[in-house]
Amino acid sequence: MIQWTQKEASLLQDLKGQEQLCVEKYNEYAQRAHDPELKNLFASIGETEVGHLKTLNDMLNGQMPQQQGQQQQQGQGQQGQGQQQQQGMQNQQGQQGQQGCQCQHVPDPGQRSQPLTPEMQQDAYLCKDLLADEKYVSASYNTSIFEFSSPQARQILNGIQSAEQKHGEQLYAYMARHGMYGA
């Protein structure tokens, strides 16, 4: 059983609270979203957030999850397979400008020919709210990682942070494809 320092335990509690809020929001927003694609995206990300919450609970209980890093990589691999295939096709077609981003090609967010419908405006609001959450949570993990003495704990938290960044990429890609980014 691992004994966390007071600071480490406090950081884990903070991260747990953030993950709990993410789980609740993704579940609620999956119900509120109008677009079936967005409902599925929210539900999928929400499931990942449940795993993050379980990991943090285990850590708070003094258990070091043994497979967390591998599970994160496997989950990201499964979620990212379609994106990687599409990215490969894009690279073959010579598309540029997405260096460092493994998300699929999206149109210029400022090039929407029609205004957003009221339903799309509501979906855009949900996406913007969750994107802001993902940015905040990812930054929280980034700061927290450096406060842990255990390399294994840092690795686990780093894996979760990477997943949070991927969620942000997925939300951005959806928003940009639907003319919602900057709307």
Regions picked out by a protein language model, each given a short descriptive name:
Residues 8-32, 92-159:
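Acidic/histidine-rich alpha-helical segments that form the ligand environment
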Residues 1-2, 183:
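Absolute protein N-terminus
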Residues 151-165, 169, 173, 182:
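Intrinsically disordered, compositionally biased tail regions
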